[in-house]
């Protein structure tokens, strides 16, 4: 079991997170001792969790048209300016119209970038595994740093963030498997085009033999809830099914994984590094297998098309067509899903231990790079993150995406 994990090295005085905590003492009104207030977590939640949380959790902004964050955020104007900055010689903002997948996909098969001007919600999970073998040190700090950064710099309100950490008294705020899955559903529920959702996981990651044949290396990536010994792990396929598949065109989900073997933790098909594109799907082949029809019917809201395609799936699958049974559905999405992670899937658990891949490296480098220059393109940010990581770690950053990404566009969130 433990050979799937890295052991976190003692950070001593060198923990990189200290650097940005010292530069910007976060004015956290709740203090780091207590959890931030989380409506819907106090009492056992009604309607199986996040259905109808109390006030402030999911209220639409007032119908003024210009109050981007429901009028709550004093820093709103400064953040909205991203777009005007983008034209002054900086990277261009994302296009507002749908973009074709191209690369052999059927005509009309498209996705949409999010302008990230809508509602914002964040789910941050940090697990130190207190009292368990393989206890980690910095994971809870990672997500507290990230929540402060999102709140101060990107207009994420505290009441629209859920933090699951294993130092909290409230059982609903413990990062158990049930709580994590429930929170993932809450995160994506009712998301609209141009919303910006954020997911951060800091804890143990590992690999398990891939049962559905969709991973090239024969392993699925997994994350380990605090109660994994009783409840089991959570596989990348399940995270994709809950957090990626339901998203409509134009919804952004940004994910950051601070864990070993997180390179494909959301099962996204396009992977970019500082060197350019590392991996892209064979869409012509997927189209030939009928895999792309389901997504585009879903994106159009054409449920009748979806049902008939799905029935076609079943018929062919029962004939034993291996490709159909294997890659149940394409991993592309009409939404705008991106994921930042360190290193590569191919890194073995032994390499991870020898390389001392430290939990927290990715989120620390992400925050540090954006603090130094908030106006970067995707490829500039990849390079900035690589430069930050190179000062302390051997791992390289990679950016995975649900669609082909124009890496020269302005990075927005």
Swiss-Prot record:
Residues 36-47 have a biased composition (Pro residues). One of its GO terms (biological process) is proteolysis. Its EC number is 3.4.22.-. Residues 1-104 are annotated as: Disordered. GO terms for cellular component: cytoplasm. Residues 49-58 have a biased composition (Low complexity). Keywords: Apoptosis, Hydrolase, Protease, Thiol protease, Zymogen. Residues 75-85 have a biased composition (Polar residues). GO terms for molecular function: cysteine-type endopeptidase activity. The active site is at residues 204, 260. It holds the Pfam family Peptidase_C14. InterPro entries: Caspase-like_dom_sf, Metacaspase, Pept_C14_caspase. Signal peptide: none annotated. SUPFAM superfamilies: Caspase-like (SSF52129). Involved in cell death (apoptosis). Required for the apoptotic-like loss of membrane phospholipid asymmetry at stationary phase and facilitates growth under conditions of endoplasmic reticulum stress. Belongs to the peptidase C14B family. This is Metacaspase-1A. It comes from Aspergillus fumigatus (strain ATCC MYA-4609 / CBS 101355 / FGSC A1100 / Af293). The gene is casA.
